[in-house]
Amino acid sequence: MRVLRSPAKVNLGLWVTGKRADGYHDIVTVFHTVDFHDRIFIKRSHSLKIKTSSPLIPEGEENIVYKALKRFEEWTGVSPEVEVFIEKNIPAGAGLGGGSSNAAVVLKEVNSMYGEILSEKELSELASTIGADVPFFLKGGLAVAEGIGDKLRFLDKKIEREIFIIYPAVHVSTKEIYSKVTPDILTKKEDLHIIDSLLDDFEYFLENIENTLGEIALESYPQMREVYNTLEYLGYKPFVSGSGSSIFAFGKPEAEIEKICQVKGWKLIKTVLR
């Protein structure tokens, strides 16, 4: 049996640049994996089985990992006979990419088990048919993503910083947030000079990043707004990951934040960018 780490990610900014003919939106965002993860146990079996530790995550055909492995079978003609157990730590609907990460990690492992039947490029192409974030998690680290999030430019440098993430126990529908995007809040791609400062001046980058979807989510979900305002009041600069619902900040959380999270029932995650 193999035990794999399936990391979460945060978005360091997210700009919506347009709406496509197929109904999806083009974005520019910066992904970075963090040292907070699900654990995945995988072994060979006589059939494909997917189980999870969370009653909130579907098993079997409705699970994103199951769908990914069935797509693998379609592409390769190889039926992956494996048993997968996902020990969930990353909350669902939190903007942390848990499901996409699970799919990518298992796809990569199964491809390895069957002798690298797909090249790195082919595996990434397959992953993009599962979900926009899935190709990123095949490698992780730091990347600038464009298109629907599937056009990736990985950066060699990693930004090792302590961060903490607060999940306010509310599931955000990304589809709902995208439906509220209006033309007046779109960003022209040519105006995104801030991306150039990502490696040269990270502090400047942090001071000036925006999150179009995050701003909509803050107006739509009072629980998120409460977390955001609490962090601002305590002197932190808060950021929304993806379309929410997680809010994160750099540094270590004060004892007061830990107490507030306990009282409010918010999940506090202390981790680092990695």
Curated annotation (Swiss-Prot):
Residues forming the catalytic site: 9, 133
EC numbers on record: 2.7.1.148
Membrane-spanning ranges: none
This protein's pathway: Isoprenoid biosynthesis; isopentenyl diphosphate biosynthesis via DXP pathway; isopentenyl diphosphate from 1-deoxy-D-xylulose 5-phosphate: step 3/6
SUPFAM superfamilies, alphabetized: GHMP Kinase, C-terminal domain, Ribosomal protein S5 domain 2-like
GO MF annotation terms: 4-(cytidine 5'-diphospho)-2-C-methyl-D-erythritol kinase activity; ATP binding
InterPro entries xrefs: GHMP_kinase_C_dom, GHMP_kinase_C_sf, GHMP_kinase_N_dom, IspE, Ribosomal_Su5_D2-typ_SF, Ribsml_uS5_D2-typ_fold_subgr
EC class (word): transferase
Keywords for the protein's UniProt record, in alphabetical order: ATP-binding, Isoprene biosynthesis, Kinase, Nucleotide-binding, Transferase
The reaction(s) this protein catalyses: 4-CDP-2-C-methyl-D-erythritol + ATP = 4-CDP-2-C-methyl-D-erythritol 2-phosphate + ADP + H(+)
Pfam families per record: GHMP_kinases_C, GHMP_kinases_N
Function: Catalyzes the phosphorylation of the position 2 hydroxy group of 4-diphosphocytidyl-2C-methyl-D-erythritol.
Family: Belongs to the GHMP kinase family. IspE subfamily.
Protein name as catalogued: 4-diphosphocytidyl-2-C-methyl-D-erythritol kinase
Organism: Persephonella marina (strain DSM 14350 / EX-H1)
